[in-house]
Amino acid sequence: LYLEDTKSETIILDDNKIKSSDYSTDLGYGFRAVTGDVVAYSHSNEISDRSLKNSSQNLKSSLKGKRGIYNTEIKNTNQKFYNDIDPVEEKSLKSKIDILNEINNYARSLDSSVKQVTANFLGEKKNIEILRSGGQLLNDERPLVRFNVSVMVEKNGRKETGVYGVGGRQSYDVYLENENWKKVCDEAFRIATTNLDSKPSPAGE
């Protein structure tokens, strides 16, 4: 039995204002039973006693007449790779919006050629539990953050865009503390200006 509970948040700044701020939750489970070369699945977005019992009965019906052996020799290799931080809750919505506005102002101040800036945050926290038929319970918590900046520059009627982003299964602070976000803006701007100064490749004859 595999159970998953996920909550996520996306905040987008575009054209000098917050374009959208979305929050969503998703949960569900999946049953899997294997007997010989026969595999049966059952899943639902509703986690309740009734739903779990129905799924269990469906699996039993699918594997009726089949007999399997429970494998107790599987070794526990689980390791804790991520911290317990919740990116969705670690900072208030206001503080995230304030940082996005700082990013917007900084990127626009890099050069007069900067005409448009888009920046967004994505935060996610996923909780997972796996219950094996022998009663063994395994669980994991997986944070995820993503931070992207897009800079559009214009010169002599020509427009080019540079996009750069960072992310990983850790806290926002890794990318935002000590104004580390400026490095992301600088790289997006560098890519945009490099594209702006580029020349067309020679055409074949």
Predicted regions and their residues:
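Active-site bordering "gate/hinge" segments
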Residues: 1-205
